[in-house]
Amino acid sequence: MKMFYSGKFIGDVRNTQNIKLAELAQGLCSTAQLARIESGVRSAEKLLFDSLYERLGKNTERFTAYLDCDEYERLLARIRICCCIDEGRYSDAREQIAAYRKATKNNIHMQYLCLAECELMQKTGSSVSACKDKLMEGIRCTYPEFDIDNIAGYYLSRLEMLHVQQYVNCIEQSGQKDRAAKLYGDILDYT
């Protein structure tokens, strides 16, 4: 019952904002799946719901989510990855990332992994160029033709925006201060 209302709410907001089904679903799920979510026929896992809702410009922190066992296990795996990176256990983090990658091919999860790998790369001294490539790989999980110079043309979730912000940070670190300043402005203007 709860998913019916949350899916219907996504549909109502999408329709109010005149966003096409395909535009909102781009890279996250099929348009048929989104239509089933909006009609209440199908529920969405938390990461998918959050991404759809955030692409509509809404905050997901007001929702309480009940996770099934699989979602809960994936959440714990993401927490373990973050803890390993934060605690400097980089080889453990790599193992956790590899195990997570084997367990899923979902674009949102792959995007998360690219962001985690980039953080790991930064902490272990990888080049700025390699980090940029990893971040672009992540954003292109959902937007294959993504153009960093035109972020206003996309509906971005919080995870996607984190990729963009980190990418611009890498541009700044590579010495392209003027380009980074322009892109930071684009991020601030993003609505």
Residue ranges and their predicted role:
Residues 65-92:
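Short, charged recognition helix plus adjacent turn
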Residues 1-16:
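A short, Lys/Arg-rich alpha-helix, primarily the initiator
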Residues 9, 75, 79, 109-120, ...:
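"A position-specific structural signal for the A-helix of alpha-solenoid helical repeats
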